[in-house]
Amino acid sequence: MLSAALAFNSYALDITHEMGTTSFETTPKKVVALDWVLTETVLSLGIELEGAANISGYQQWVAEPHLNADAIDVGSRREPNLELLSNIKPDVILISKHLAAAYEPLSKIAPVLVYSVYSEDKQPLESAKRITRSLGKLFDKEQQAEQVIAQTDQRLAANGAKITSAGKAEKPLLFARFINDKTLRIHSEGSLAQDTINAMGLKNDWQEPTNLWGFTTTGTEKLAEHQKANVMIFGPLSQEERQQLTQSPLWQAMEFSRTDSVYELPAIWTFGGLLAAQRLSDHITGRLTQPQ
């Protein structure tokens, strides 16, 4: 009996997160994630989720890693269903600081850990690595966590080398998501795109101030100042959006349009973690090294 008690107590684990330190006496099994980047990170460790926020949105925008089919949709990322969460009885709930207002009510349901990949630090890739290690410790998946981190570093470096050997590394990149025909978001400092291409040895042509998510909202006319860049458009664009864009006289006049230096990327969660960075890197590499 004594040896069993000692064994039980020896597992007690303190996890430090952005709103304190939480103790666990056993490895959490029923896990709920209310932020897509945390959903992605948990799944990357080979752990299935008991619940996740806005599952249809995750499947559309994040896509990989695939969410287990029996995961329960617990409501939106901004307003999770507290009653449903109470019924699930999770062992741990994972949120980002952007949901900090819900910390107290959620803490009445289960221990809550707060991790933010995107913040004023503007180092999402390093933050994602730190969080991956912390969750690896929590779920007794430390070896898997290190494998995910090493795989990310290796993939980004290898893709960068592939682009360099293809002679495509000198031309700077510009990452844009179109909001409408007059407005777009351009991703640079503090974005997943910026940290990913930094690790690949590539350059970003956009150097304007960004918000904590790593993008600048601006007018499409600003593209005229970046005509020598390879333009990466975050998709997917609808046929109507694509037609509206390509038929615009302004767009047609741009040097990057005339030199076929515009590339549409598939749905990639631009506010994701390490696996999202791998996917983004793969698609950038595929676009830049494909035969013209």
Swiss-Prot record:
The organism of origin for this protein: Vibrio vulnificus
Subunit structure: The complex is composed of two ATP-binding proteins (VatC), two transmembrane proteins (VatB) and a solute-binding protein (VatD).
Residue sites binding desferrioxamine B per the record: 61, 77, 118, 185, 213, 215, 269, 271
InterPro entries for the chain: ABC_transptr_periplasmic_BD, Bact_iron-sidero_bind
Name the record gives this protein: Ferric aerobactin-binding protein VatD
GO cellular component terms, A-Z: ATP-binding cassette (ABC) transporter complex; outer membrane-bounded periplasmic space; periplasmic space
Effect of inactivating the gene: Impaired ability to utilize aerobactin as a heterologous siderophore. No effect on growth. VatD/fatB double deletion mutant shows significantly greater growth impairment than single fatB mutant under low-iron concentration condition.
Primary role: Part of the ABC transporter complex VatCDB involved in the import of iron(3+)-complexed aerobactin, a citrate-hydroxamate siderophore produced by other bacteria. Binds the iron(3+)-aerobactin complex and transfers it to the membrane-bound permease. Functions in the import of iron(3+)-complexed vulnibactin, a catecholate siderophore synthesized by V.vulnificus, in the absence of FatB.
Domain of life according to the entry: Bacteria
Residue ranges annotated for the Fe/B12 periplasmic-binding domain, each copy included: 30-292
Family, as annotated: Belongs to the bacterial solute-binding protein 8 family.
Record's keyword terms, sorted: Ion transport, Iron, Iron transport, Periplasm, Signal, Transport
Induction remarks: Expression is up-regulated by low iron concentration condition from early to mid logarithmic growth phase. Expression is repressed by Fur under iron-repleted condition.
Gene name linked to the record: vatD
Localization, UniProt: Periplasm
SUPFAM superfamilies given in the database record: Helical backbone' metal receptor
GO process annotations (BP): aerobactin transport; ferric-hydroxamate import into cell; intracellular iron ion homeostasis; iron ion transport; siderophore transmembrane transport
Main location: periplasm
Signal peptide location: 1-12
